[in-house]
Amino acid sequence: RRQRQMCIRDRFTVKAELPENQRGTSASYFDLRVSPNQAQTLNVVIQNRQADPVTVLIKVNPAFTNDNGVVEYGEQVGRTDASLKVNLKTLLKAPTEVTIPALSQQTVPLQLKLPAQAFAGTVLGGLQFMAKPDEKATTSGAVANRYVYALGVVLTESDQVVPPNLRVQEVKAVSDHGHNAIQANIQNFEPAMLKDLTVEGKIFEADGSKTLYQTRKHELKMAPNSNFNFKVDLNDEPLKPGKYRFEGVAKAGGRTWHFKKTFMVAQKEADDLNAAAVKKAPAQANAIDWRLMILAGLVVLLTINVIAFKRYARHHRGA
């Protein structure tokens, strides 16, 4: 068996004890070739590197895609996609917490049980290890240092490639940290990882052809069977009620997806979002007006030329 080690700062370390069905030789996470109805014990070794006992909380989570287009393995309530049929959280069981004595290590067994029915594509998730907060620190109101690490788990049953596939779901107006935006939820509804994704979105009036707003993002990733909220910024302009159209183009791996969806912004919705939005900074009263600067320069040059001409004329009259 091979071992790979990841250090969570210097408080404790986690090692994945890679089994014989590990795919590849360089991965530091579990990347396993499995089969239907398979049962297997996976081991991780947690080493406490400090002089006091440490309690480590362990969670199993399915992978999800955050709204920045980054794949994460932490716990996120409400982010599990409706298209996810095989969830790592139901396949892999781990103790909720373990306490490691000072300056020692402990092997923690995890129980993996595959469903009887074969699955296609990739099951992706992770193990989250977090130092349990100090109760004294939390009750006193002090900010507790929390050491967190996510160890990836990848499961496949064959080399058959399942291509990713995208579609747009709900489109609506939202507040993005105090800034008005149009949010289009984009879903990857296949059990396939998506990398180097570029998405461009444009907003039009429902029957219009003029682009009102647009946003382009690149180098995004998506977990299998996940979704994320792609936001088109309104440049701090007030949101107007009415019927609009979202058009998007996504590109990855030589494939292209086109999206189109109409949506409504109600009067009250626009009023509420505008009231809560960060107001666009007004132009400064003393901002430079370049036209006035140019005009002033021409006046100065004209004045200099007039004075020079008068001196020249006086000089020649007196000669």
Protein language model features and the residues they cover:
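Short, small-residue-biased leader/transition segments that mark boundaries at the very start
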Residues: 3-8
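Short solvent-exposed strand-capping/beta-turn motif centered on an Asx-Ser/Thr pair
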Residues: 47-52, 63, 117, 187-193
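C-terminal membrane-anchoring or membrane-association module
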Residues: 292-319
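Intrinsically disordered, low-complexity Pro/Gly/Ser/Thr-rich segments with frequent PxxP/GP/PP motifs
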Residues: 78-118, 204-239
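Beta-sheet-dominated interaction scaffolds and their linkers
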Residues: 16-50, 54, 97-98, 165-177
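Membrane-proximal extracellular "stem/stalk" segments
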Residues: 156-292
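Terminal connector regions
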Residues: 52-79, 107, 113-160, 237-276
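Short, solvent-exposed loop/turn segments enriched in Ser/Thr/Gly
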Residues: 26, 37-43, 106-108, 120-126, ...
